[in-house]
Amino acid sequence: MEASVHIGNSVPHAHLHSAAPARPADPVRPDGSRRALRIGLGGPVGSGKTATVAALCRALRDRLSIAVVTNDIYTREDADFLLRHAILPAERILAVETGACPHTAIRDDISANLEAVEQLEATVGPLDLILVESGGDNLTATFSKGLVDAQIFVIDVAGGDDIPRKGGPGITTADLLVINKTDLAPHVGSDLQAMAADAKRQRGERPVAFTSLTADNGVGPVADWVGARLTAWTAA
């Protein structure tokens, strides 16, 4: 059992965590209605996860009821960024301080994140979508199916155009791979066509989205994918 700290808005409290459930989370609320779709966003430090979360919220918040859970090891920096830029009202953003390797809190011991998700459902709901952002991690980071229903993995061209070729569970198994900061490709010498080809070899038919969040509607391909997942989720 591992102790860590969970921040709900700004009130910290300690938890003793148990192992993550192996089976997918129940899609139905206690009242029989379908709960919010939960999508996890993972990726290396600096790849643009928080910026992607912010852009998704801006693109979708006028038509969907959204909440966010962020993960940081010792701070609530990502949550503070979202609050500072008025991405969502404060009550729709919860921060988890993992106190350990970021992947532990999203895959091996999800209890703090699961509590945050369930707290949002209970206090802010009904919600359509909850985004769970992992702390920055390496290419092996994946989410437990007991926490999220789908996973987005974010990399960026500044990390090198060989990243898709290197693979790793984040690259190969995520439901959507996002290759971010395409506007920087000419400046860092990254070959977008090579990245696309390598991603295709690693992922087969799983989708890949190229994004530049500095462009108008730069998050559009990701927002469209989320919208399609939500349509399928609510129709199930």
Swiss-Prot record:
The keyword Hydrolase does not apply. GO terms for cellular component: cytoplasm. One of its GO terms (biological process) is urea catabolic process. Residues 1-40 are annotated as: Disordered. It is found in: Cytoplasm. The keyword Chaperone applies. Homodimer. UreD, UreF and UreG form a complex that acts as a GTP-hydrolysis-dependent molecular chaperone, activating the urease apoprotein by helping to assemble the nickel containing metallocenter of UreC. The UreE protein probably delivers the nickel. Facilitates the functional incorporation of the urease nickel metallocenter. This process requires GTP hydrolysis, probably effectuated by UreG. This is Urease accessory protein UreG 2. It comes from Saccharopolyspora erythraea (strain ATCC 11635 / DSM 40517 / JCM 4748 / NBRC 13426 / NCIMB 8594 / NRRL 2338). The gene is ureG2.
